[in-house]
Amino acid sequence: MVRMAGIRLAAFVGQLAVGQEEYESEEYTWDSIGEKYAQYPDLPKVVYVYNCMSQGLLHDTYVYGVDAKKIVPTILSPTEVMDGAIVSGNCVSACDKNPTYVHENNPVVHDLFEEHGKTINFVCQILTNENVYLADKMRSSDWTAKMCRLLDLDAVIVSQEGFGNPDTDLIMNCKKIEAEGVKTVIITDEYAGRDGKSQSLADADPAADAVVTGGNANQVIVLPKMDKVIGTEEFVTI
């Protein structure tokens, strides 16, 4: 109920901006995969493999209203996600889970759009999950790798949501897509200890040889005292 109230409140606040002209706007269009192949035949064909949290118990994501635990890897256009196809059901911890706003404004998607038609041919994104059972992980990663092969891709970017258990989904996808002959880059969510010297991922493989780190979430950051705080400070030291 609390989450539904939050979604309704977000929709209400968003309605206040309807009809306002004092903002910047960008228009994104999306062609079919066949049209993309015809438009840019000489550019490397790239797909974004989009891992979503689906572990249950406040670690869920909803795709068009369906619990992501129950989906198989699915092709979505980025514009669908921009329009709210993915809704977060997570107990969001800073930097580690994606709220709905981040799904709608995914920086990986925006950067791929920026390079589309220039340096790459951004074909589509494959949405997949991060279930807790090994059989589910194997099925989803097998399916994702098969889709990458059928799309005849040159390169794939794989991101993860969360850490620990999802590290396995990240690496499974990477090594299986690489085994299909598709160059793969992973974007990590790392926990390397406060000094940065611990093993940062719970899984690894030699195939994961192109890595973009999301930083060390164990690092302690000291923030300066603010002159004004909106809200309560009671829970800061818990």
What do the PLM-derived regions correspond to, one by one?
Residues 1-238:
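An N-terminal assembly and electron-transfer interface module characteristic of large anaerobic redox
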